[in-house]
Regions:
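Juxta-kinase regulatory segment immediately upstream of eukaryotic protein kinase catalytic domains
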Residues: 2-45
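ATP-binding glycine-rich loop module of kinase domains
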Residues: 44-88
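Short, surface-exposed coil-to-beta transition loops
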Residues: 51-52, 107-109, 150-152
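Short, solvent-exposed coil/turn segments at beta-strand boundaries
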Residues: 58-63, 107, 115-118, 145, ...
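Conserved structural core of kinase catalytic domains
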Residues: 68, 87-134
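Active-site-adjacent loop/helix micro-motif of nuclease/hydrolase catalytic cores
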Residues: 71-83, 122-132, 174
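Protein kinase catalytic-loop region centered on the HRD/HxD motif
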Residues: 138-145
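Catalytic activation segment of kinase domains across protein kinase-like and atypical kinase folds
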Residues: 146-181
Length: 181
């Protein structure tokens, strides 16, 4: 019996939305317009967010990401880094901090699927969030793996627990601030 979990639903969604985005999927503005057209045609409310190198298509229960930065395509992109880092977190026992990322290859492109989480809706740094404090062990693990961009747009909560959703690493050292808030 085939499961109908968020990953399976995301794969079906990718197959359905791909014709809308394939023409210019490495341009975030074009993807945004294509998703608007998809929403009209299928009466959906799918959102698009993008950063410096990745596009995230957000539905009600999952997120589909892909790299669009030319350097990311030629080298290991941020989405692939997230898969590698998640695997390392599983090995080290820190996977509870992260949304699981899985890869789905379709029509020669790699898409990355993760569950949707509840955002916090206001700008807060994960290290000083009033409702959650990372342990020193968790901070040390994040520092050792160059996770330095953990602001409110990159994490949220799932089932009452913190969940990091954007965890591609940045190659530089970071000094922890032990300030009280």
């Amino acid at each position: 019996m085939k499961k109908n979990n968020y990953e399976v639903r995301a794969q079906k969604f990718i197959q359905k939305v791909f014709p809308y985005i394939e023409e210019d999927m490495f341009n975030p503005y074009s993807v945004e317009k294509a998703i608007d057209k998809f929403n009209e045609d299928f009466h959906r409310s799918v959102k698009v967010h993008y950063g410096d190198a990745r596009i995230a298509i957000i539905t009600s229960d999952y997120v589909v990401k892909f790299d669009y930065d030319s350097e990311s395509i030629e080298e290991i992109g941020g989405c692939e880094q997230e898969i590698e880092l998640y695997e390392q977190a599983v090995e080290d026992g820190f996977d509870y901090l992260f949304a699981k990322t899985s890869r789905y290859d379709y029509e020669g492109y790699s898409f990355y699927i993760m569950p949707k989480i509840n955002g916090i809706g206001q700008y807060k740094n994960i290290y000083h969030h009033a409702d959650y404090y990372m342990t020193y062990e968790e901070k040390d693990w994040c520092d050792a793996h160059n996770l330095t961009d953990l602001h409110c747009n990159n994490y949220g909560f799932r089932k009452g627990k913190v969940c990091i959703v954007d965890y591609a690493f940045i190659e530089h050292e970071f000094e922890w601030e032990d300030e009280e808030y």
